[in-house]
Amino acid sequence: MTHAAASGIDSGPVTSPFDIEDYLRRVSGRVDGHLRRIAADQKRQRPARLAEAIEYALLGGGKRLRPALVLASCEALGGDPGDDGLALRFALALEMIHTYSLVHDDLPAMDDDDLRRGRPTVHKAYDEATAVLVGDGLQSLAFRHLLGTGDPRAAALAALLADGALRMVQGQALDIGAEGRKLTEDEVLELMAAKTGALISAAVVGGAIAATGSPRGLEPVGRKLGLAFQIADDLLDLTGDAAALGKRVGKDQAAGKATLPSLVGVDEARRRAGAACDEALAVLAPLGAPAEALRALARFVVTRKR
């Protein structure tokens, strides 16, 4: 069986070495199709302005990395990442939670960003009140979609998603409270694990639960990839290109936010991101060929340019 068939993504065989960009494009196309249907369902309801803003937020592009991690993790453990599977439901719910977090993070009271993925942020395209309601609505839609099945594992996944979302909010609160203060390395790592790491970790663990009913020892993979992702994000904010990223760069430094690169330097931060990735790969090694996509995603987390 080709990898594409195993993933439920109909686009032919994947060449070796693993083409991660092609894999992400296929996952993104598949996820976008489902999100488009969810958004279309909302547009049949009132008020129309809120439904349009939800669609604008959901279909704003992006790598769809978190859904890809869910599906790859599920596949790594022999689960069904197909269109009728629980893994896809969780992947879509997780992406809706992630999207809500971006909409709220961009608000003037938070990060005050005008641009996201090369487009005006929701509060700029609409208004601040609508952006708040979009985030609120996406939270509800996420859990309604996930729980719209009789599968008993959905309850465990809903609890995982709720915990991840709560930790993300706690991380944002820590981040806001830390502006202008000098944090210790342990405090920075705690912030990173919550603000960004929580949903990355939930993606990996959620895929395992969808496949087997339990995390199956993938919690360390989720934690390590969450750490590596946030370090890479902080490095991109320091050294990335605004046009390529589709958003403002240098904002953390300008706001006086504590990041790992600001504490230990760019080179050491890169080394630690690579080390975290290597530790995740070591856990995945015994899973063999079924974990090929998940291993490729782990490497992508630290090598990405956007």
Regions found by a protein language model. Name each.
Residues 1-39:
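N-terminal amphipathic/basic leader segments beginning at the initiator methionine
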Residues 44-282, 289-302:
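Mg2+-dependent prenyl diphosphate-binding active-site environment of isoprenoid biosynthetic enzymes
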